[in-house]
């Protein structure tokens, strides 16, 4: 897939995952030490504890402190404090009729076990993982002051090959890779998934009719809507922050250019002009500009288009290939695909300019997508000759690999916060 994407870009310029496994490959010393006490011995209790521990580890902001006793036993806050925990999560799971009651407390181990948070929920059996992610969000926000991202979702393309045939599917899963759902399945390529700002729809490119077309699909119902189906390229859809427009790439007039599609009226407006190829648009979070990739300077570089006056300015100058750029939601950084010495890695640059810093180093990385809290970057890479997903923190100090158990996983997209 990596070679196919690069080959496609050069051509333009010359004429089911069951779950994802976490592997922490690099960490930091400033993580907050926290202990997750057992929620009980039954399956639901163990699953909740495991999910919370995994979530907080993925965030890169916490160091998990293990208790001295067995996995099904609870330790006192004072004991866990002696082992190094600053905070302790303790929970209980009970069956109440055909419902499950889950209670948890978050205690400050430094302040003699002072209770910071306590809540009780009643759920159905199929809501166990969702509640565990919600508890993780509550704990994360209480201790960091920031909203948690554990109840968000990810979309990606899964490719399964059998002999000479390929099966493409657009998958949506929890942020930790569990609970995957196939929104679409096709024998032809599916590309470029992008979440709507409200998290209810995904835009994508389909080749199901042996040509490129842009669709949106409802995550809840699977209902689709055809957006563009012009001769030639229909690609790289990106939502405006208000969800009312899509920026797309069309070659209907010759050279690929960026257009704005009004989703209410269907009207279109051309945004870029000239003889160079313009592609991969991404709106800024404030809706005032677009980042896009263009060869107008002689090599693929990132440019910024002001939507107020149409002025275009070059953003990247380092290296001879920078592409797939997007702002972090807080607009402090720009994340991109950066080539250096024939190695394709994920790079980051301050929004105001300056050098590009590599966040990854495998040389086979692509498709960066930033978490809604701006702290993590999800991306596609290769590991043991397979397409897998990786996560790296925006400062590069946390790196994780999420290997798929079957098929190739590619082109990830992180959802916004979900209500």
Swiss-Prot record:
The keyword Transport does not apply. GO terms for biological process: cell division; protein import. Pfam families: PD40 (PF07676), TolB_N (PF04052). Keywords: Cell cycle, Cell division, Periplasm, Signal. The keyword Glycoprotein does not apply. Belongs to the TolB family. The Tol-Pal system is composed of five core proteins: the inner membrane proteins TolA, TolQ and TolR, the periplasmic protein TolB and the outer membrane protein Pal. They form a network linking the inner and outer membranes and the peptidoglycan layer. This is Tol-Pal system protein TolB. It comes from Legionella pneumophila subsp. pneumophila (strain Philadelphia 1 / ATCC 33152 / DSM 7513). The gene is tolB.
């Amino acid at each position: 897939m990596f070679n196919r994407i690069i080959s496609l870009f050069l051509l333009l310029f010359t004429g089911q995952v069951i779950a994802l496994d976490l592997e922490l490959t690099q960490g930091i010393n400033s993580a907050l030490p926290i202990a997750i006490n057992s929620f009980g011995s039954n399956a639901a209790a163990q699953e909740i504890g495991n999910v919370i521990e995994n979530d907080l580890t993925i965030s890169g902001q916490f160091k998990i402190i293990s208790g001295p006793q067995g996995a099904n036993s609870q330790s006192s806050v004072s004991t866990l404090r002696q082992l190094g925990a600053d905070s302790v999560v303790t929970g209980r799971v009970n069956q109440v009729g055909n419902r499950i009651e889950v209670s948890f407390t978050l205690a400050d181990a430094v302040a003699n076990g002072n209770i910071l948070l306590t809540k009780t929920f009643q759920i159905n059996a199929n809501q166990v993982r969702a509640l565990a992610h919600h508890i993780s969000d509550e704990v994360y926000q209480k201790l960091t002051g920031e909203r948690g991202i554990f109840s968000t979702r990810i979309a990606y393309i899964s490719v399964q090959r059998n002999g000479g045939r390929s099966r493409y599917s657009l998958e949506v899963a929890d942020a930790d890779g569990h609970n995957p759902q196939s929104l679409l399945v096709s024998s032809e390529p599916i590309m470029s998934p992008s979440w709507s700002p409200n998290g209810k729809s995904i835009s994508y490119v389909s080749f199901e009719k042996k040509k490129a077309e842009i669709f949106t699909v409802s995550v809840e119902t699977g209902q689709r809507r055809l957006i563009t189906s012009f001769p030639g390229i229909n690609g790289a859809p990106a939502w405006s922050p208000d969800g009312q427009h899509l920026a797309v790439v069309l070659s209907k007039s010759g050279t690929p250019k960026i257009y704005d599609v009004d989703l209410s009226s269907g009207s279109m407006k051309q945004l870029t002009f000239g003889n160079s190829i313009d592609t991969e648009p991404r709106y800024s979070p404030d809706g005032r500009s677009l980042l896009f990739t263009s060869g107008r300077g002689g090599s693929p570089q990132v440019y910024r288009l002001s939507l107020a006056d149409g002025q275009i300015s070059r953003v990247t100058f380092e290296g001879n290939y920078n592409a797939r750029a997007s702002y972090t939601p807080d607009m402090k950084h720009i994340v991109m695909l950066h080539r250096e010495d024939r190695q394709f890695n994920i790079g980051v640059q301050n929004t105001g300019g300056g050098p590009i810093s590599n966040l990854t180093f495998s040389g086979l990385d692509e498709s960066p997508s930033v978490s809604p809290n701006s702290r993590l970057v999800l991306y596609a890479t290769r590991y043991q000759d397979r397409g897998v997903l990786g996560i790296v923190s925006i400062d590069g100090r946390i790196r994780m690999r999420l290997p798929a158990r079957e098929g190739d996983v590619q082109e990830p997209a992180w959802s916004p916060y979900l209500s």
